[in-house]
A protein has these predicted regions:
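Low-complexity, acidic/polar, glycine-enriched regions of mature
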Residues: 19-184
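Bacterial Sec-dependent N-terminal signal peptides
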Residues: 1-21
Length: 184
């Protein structure tokens, strides 16, 4: 009888954990443009993300002006001329993790997944699929992703004067160091 009760408690705790919302306010997104003249990199360390583990729904949101560049002039051009951050202040990704029901939160492991969703940036929404690695260690959950986007897909125009300095294919790296349970 005691074994049945213990098993039931373990089962219910795993079900409860698998149905929670996990979030972070301190995720980071780094983008890199490698071009013949220079490499440009910027980081935004204030990425908000919420993951509903029961459904696999996941969302990322960030303010475009949150990207930090090594040079102030780069940041100014990025916000005013390319991403027009006053007009389009946010980038948002809403997606679903494929086969999320197979993720066991009780085991330490790394699970490679695909995330299908809609990336909205610069006023344009585009369906994309991105690879991600979800790491579970001692009950803590983190996630990494690395993928490429095209500036043309989001109508981001690069003047010909600087076209040798900016690659139209941008590498995007997402790092969510620790998801925490979202409490009401």
């Amino acid at each position: 009888m005691k074994i049945k009760i213990l098993f039931l408690i373990l089962l219910l705790s795993n079900v409860a954990k698998s149905q929670q919302k996990l979030y972070t306010k301190n995720g980071s997104i780094t983008f890199t443009s490698k071009a013949p003249v220079q490499t440009i990199e910027a980081v935004n360390n204030k990425v908000l993300s919420v993951w509903e583990t029961a459904t696999g729904n996941i969302e990322f949101s960030l303010l475009i002006k949150g990207f930090q560049f090594p040079k102030a002039l780069m940041q100014e051009h990025f916000n005013e001329n390319y991403l027009e951050s006053d007009k389009f202040p946010k980038a948002i990704f809403k997606g679903v993790i494929e086969n999320s029901k197979n993720i066991l939160f009780t085991n330490d492991n790394v699970i490679n997944v695909k995330v299908n969703g809609l990336l909205t940036m610069h006023g344009i929404s585009k369906q994309i699929t991105i690879p991600a690695a979800i790491k579970i260690k001692k009950g803590e959950v983190s996630a990494l992703s690395n993928f490429i986007i095209s500036l043309d897909d989001y109508a981001i125009k690069i003047p010909s004067v600087v076209s040798e300095s900016i690659n139209k294919k941008i590498n995007v790296q997402i790092n969510i160091p620790l998801f925490k349970p979202l409490t009401k």
